[in-house]
């Protein structure tokens, strides 16, 4: 039977978040204020007009990473493998720091709108669309995974239907994201992070004083855990590198970086948010340690609802460590506060992922690939439709797919294996080209898929060294990533040499990126595509070659120079 008091508490929390989201959305400038600035309306919705201060940026960056899966996963990992098995908090914290060092300043200085802009700027629109596939899958499955975690938590503590709780949470997050854009997402993240921090810390001491909970300091060796032998250490390192570098190429990260007022602020929020992720992992880690050192026979917990009690949580129930601690080791009112914390964590991540996927579709797919002449109003409408569609897809997946965590895990692998080397090369390797990018994409994808994924019942078509009992202990993910990066470099350099030396005829340059550059890739003052082609975002032809500048063209600032919407009024009157 549903707990009415708990439902009232959750409804109050949801109403609070909704009100804050609507209020924050009103901070956006009106359409009249934005008419004089080319591209300003799009930036206002997608990036809050690049007006997010460092403090708010730190809060929203931290809140996005500290989602429901982060909290539940940290507690579960510590319960199963101890502190050494709890890699996500440390991995994601280092990931934020590395992102700040490698990409935050460079990407913000270039004035990009999304993570995919440098790909379309250098390789062309179609490559940007190809990079969108793993990015979209990752964001959507991530949203579905955290919604599923919330539904399971609400069903355990409140006894309400999982479908109803997931649908309601998704609708609220989608609604304020739809109406308020990035402003709503950023400011609700501030409230949600506060709720997460307070809610979890209220629950920890309450759980510690339960009669069944033992003093965790007396059994430190038990909850610290161990990695294992050489094979296990190899797998541990592979997974840690996946978290560190695979956590960078996500639009949710770059949305915060690119919305910062300055490039220095973008770096600062990355560094400080990394520390914030570590601090926010302490409460769920303690919850996992408490659960690991609890004699569950001294509680009312019966995993099979038949009166049978167990000393420890069964393996198939350990993904519910956090809600079980709330339910059986804390007073009722404390459990409701903890539930609010988990709900806040889920919504702070879900809204960000939905907006990120929708922004990439509207800007990189619709505007730069499908409809290059689309107005800003049309792009914003498309983005809002995409917000609804992504929200619906994630909700359906959360309700229907049993192995949603497995799908998200596989997508996270693909982001690490495919997108990270691509992003590193497009930013730091001036001679990389479309041929290298395509070859690297294919190599990374194949090497990862042949390794299999048990979580989604994908068999291993190739047994890497140390393959034992269905487990790939060899660091094949990192091997695939490095192979992809090496392929990008080698194919790019060799293709350039072959074409420029004359060994290959220019007609064979079918991608038009070395010597056979199509006429529509060269900016012409009489062509509207001059204002919107991704190859002219920085007034350069593909692969960084300086492009001719029209004598009547006015100088542009840092952002408008790179902006596909800049000076459309000029081209609309001079393109006939």
UniProtKB/Swiss-Prot annotation:
The chain crosses the membrane at residues 6-26, 52-72, 83-103, 127-147, 166-186, 193-213, 234-254, 271-291, 320-340, 379-399, 409-429, 438-458, 479-499. Residues 566-576 have a biased composition (Polar residues). The keyword GTP-binding does not apply. InterPro entries: Choline_transporter, Na/Glc_symporter_sf, Na/solute_symporter. Detected in the nervous system, including the nerve ring and cholinergic motor neurons of the ventral nerve cord. GO terms for biological process: acetylcholine biosynthetic process; choline transport. Residues 73-82, 148-165, 214-233, 292-319, 400-408, 459-478 are extracellular. This is High-affinity choline transporter 1. It comes from Caenorhabditis elegans. The gene is cho-1.
């Amino acid at each position: 039977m549903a707990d009415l008091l708990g439902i009232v508490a959750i409804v109050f929390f949801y109403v609070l978040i909704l009100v804050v989201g609507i209020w924050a959305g009103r901070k956006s400038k009106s359409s009249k204020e934005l008419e004089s600035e080319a591209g300003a309306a799009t930036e206002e919705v997608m990036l809050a007009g690049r007006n997010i201060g460092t403090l708010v940026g730190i809060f929203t960056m931290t809140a996005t990473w500290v989602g429901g899966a982060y909290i539940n996963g940290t507690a579960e990992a510590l319960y199963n493998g101890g502190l050494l098995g709890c890699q996500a908090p440390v991995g994601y914290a280092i990931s934020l720091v590395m992102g700040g060092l490698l990409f935050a300043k460079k990407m913000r200085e270039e004035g990009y709108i999304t993570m995919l802009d440098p790909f379309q700027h250098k390789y062309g629109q179609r490559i940007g669309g190809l990079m969108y596939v793993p990015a979209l899958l990752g964001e959507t499955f991530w949203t579905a995974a955290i919604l599923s975690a919330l539904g399971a938590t609400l069903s355990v503590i409140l006894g309400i239907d999982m479908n109803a709780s997931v649908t309601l949470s998704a609708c609220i997050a989608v609604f304020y994201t739809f109406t308020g854009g990035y402003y709503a997402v950023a400011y609700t993240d501030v409230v949600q992070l506060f709720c997460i921090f307070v809610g979890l810390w209220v629950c920890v001491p309450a759980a510690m004083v339960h009669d069944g909970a033992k003093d965790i300091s007396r059994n430190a060796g038990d909850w610290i855990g161990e990695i294992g032998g050489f094979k296990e250490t190899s797998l541990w390192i592979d997974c840690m590198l996946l978290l560190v570098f695979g956590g960078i190429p996500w639009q949710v990260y770059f949305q915060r970086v690119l919305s910062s007022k300055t490039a220095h602020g973008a770096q600062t929020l990355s560094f400080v948010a990394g520390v914030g992720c570590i601090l926010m992992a302490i409460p769920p880690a303690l919850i996992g340690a408490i659960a690991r050192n609890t004699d569950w026979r001294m509680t009312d917990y019966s995993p099979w609802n038949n009166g049978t009690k167990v000393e420890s949580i069964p393996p198939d129930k350990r993904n519910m460590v956090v809600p079980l601690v709330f339910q059986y080791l804390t007073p009722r009112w404390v459990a409701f506060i903890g539930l609010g914390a988990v709900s806040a964590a889920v919504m702070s991540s879900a809204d960000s992922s939905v907006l990120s996927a929708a922004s990439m579709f509207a800007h990189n797919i619709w505007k730069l690939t499908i409809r290059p002449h689309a107005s800003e109003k049309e792009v914003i409408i498309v983005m809002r439709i995409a917000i609804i569609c992504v929200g619906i897809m994630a909700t359906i997946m959360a309700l229907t797919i049993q192995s949603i965590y497995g799908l998200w895990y596989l997508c996270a692998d693909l982001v690490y294996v495919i997108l990270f080397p691509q992003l590193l090369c497009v930013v730091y390797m001036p001679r990389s080209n479309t041929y290298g990018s395509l070859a690297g994409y294919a190599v990374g994808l194949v090497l990862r898929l042949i390794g299999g994924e048990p979580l989604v019942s994908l068999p291993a078509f190739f047994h890497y060294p140390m393959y034992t009992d269905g487990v790939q202990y060899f660091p094949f993910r990192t091997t695939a990533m490095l192979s992809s990066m090496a392929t990008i470099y080698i194919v790019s350099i060799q293709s350039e040499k072959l074409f420029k030396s004359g060994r290959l005829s220019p007609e064979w340059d079918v991608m038009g990126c070395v010597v056979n550059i199509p006429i529509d890739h060269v900016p012409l003052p009489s062509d509207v595509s001059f204002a919107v082609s991704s190859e002219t975002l920085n007034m350069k032809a593909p692969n960084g070659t300086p492009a001719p500048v029209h004598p009547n063209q006015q100088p542009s600032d840092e952002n408008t120079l790179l902006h596909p919407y800049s000076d459309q009024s000029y081209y609309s009157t001079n393109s006939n």
